[in-house]
C-alpha cells in the first residue's frame, strides 16, 4: 500500500470505502477499494481471494479493469482503473433535460457487450445498479464490481449500513430461488434501461393529470417550463425548476414484498402459463393479488416499438425465456447505434 497515495474518498459502496488514489511509481490515477471484512472471521476468506483473482483475467473495454489485489494482514484492497462518474450521478444531473436516445442506446449496447463477455466466461454480477456502472468523458460505460457478489456475498446493508436497493433485483431472487443464472443480470439491466428514459418531478404526474382532466389542452406549468428551458438551450438547472426534478426507477420498492408487488402491478401477476414453475418457488404465495399486465407504451412512454420489444424481452418473467446479452446485441433496436459523447459535469 506504500505505493499509493490517497487523493480523496469518492464513495462508500456495497463492499467498502472507495478512494481516488495515485500510484507513486507510475503516476497513474486509480480507484482503490478497501473491502470491509467480517471482524469475526480470521483474515480474508480464501474463496474470496480465488474469486477476485479470476476477475483480473476479465479483459474487456466495457468492464472496469481490476489492476491489482493487495492483501495485507486482515485488510484487502482492490485496485481498479479510475473513471470519472457513475451512471446514477449522471442520470441525476440529466434529470431536467433527459438523456439523449443515441446516448442511451450506446450505453445499453456497451453494457450488453460487457455482460455477454462475462457471461461467456460464466461470471455473473448479481448486483447491477446505476451506482456500479461507470462512465468517462469519451462516451464509454463500464461494468464495475463484477464478480464481487460471488466473492463476498450480496449483503443486506452497505458499508454505511444503508439498505442495499432492491429496485434492480430479478423476481426469481425475490421469490427465493437459490439457483439462478445469467438472466438475473439481464433483468437488472432492463430496469436500468427503462430508468434512463424516465424523468419525473415531485407532483408533476398529479399536476399534469389534473391539468388535462380540467379540459386544458395546453401544457401544464412544469411542461411549459421544460419546453422553455429546452428552447433556451437547457441552461436552467434542476435547482431552479418549479419542483425538484429527479429520475424515476421502474420498480422503486422499499421492501421485498413491495418490490414484488410493484413488478406484478406493471407486468401482471405471474402464473404457470407465463412462468412455468413459479407457483412452486419458496416465497410464492397463492394469496398474491392478481394484477393484469400494463401496456408497455404507457409504462415507458419515450420508448419506440423496437425499444419496447427489447425491454419486454429483458423483463420476461421466465428466466429461461429472458433474452441473453448476446441475442440482445442483435436486436433491431441497435441497428443505428453510434457512440456519442456525454456532457459530464466533473
Curated annotation (Swiss-Prot):
EC number: 2.7.11.22
Residues that, per the record, bind Mg(2+): 132, 145
Residue numbers of N6-acetyllysine PTMs: 6
Domain annotation Protein kinase: ranges: 4-334
Modified residues (N-acetylmethionine): 1
Residues bound to ATP: 10-18, 33, 81-83, 86, 129-132, 145
MF terms in GO: ATP binding; cyclin binding; cyclin-dependent protein kinase activity; cyclin-dependent protein serine/threonine kinase activity; histone kinase activity; kinase activity; magnesium ion binding; protein domain specific binding
Record field: catalytic activity: L-seryl-[protein] + ATP = O-phospho-L-seryl-[protein] + ADP + H(+); L-threonyl-[protein] + ATP = O-phospho-L-threonyl-[protein] + ADP + H(+)
Modifications made to the protein after synthesis: Phosphorylated at Thr-160 by CDK7 in a CAK complex. Phosphorylation at Thr-160 promotes kinase activity, whereas phosphorylation at Tyr-15 by WEE1 reduces slightly kinase activity. Phosphorylated on Thr-14 and Tyr-15 during S and G2 phases before being dephosphorylated by CDC25A.
Name by which UniProt lists this protein: Cyclin-dependent kinase 2
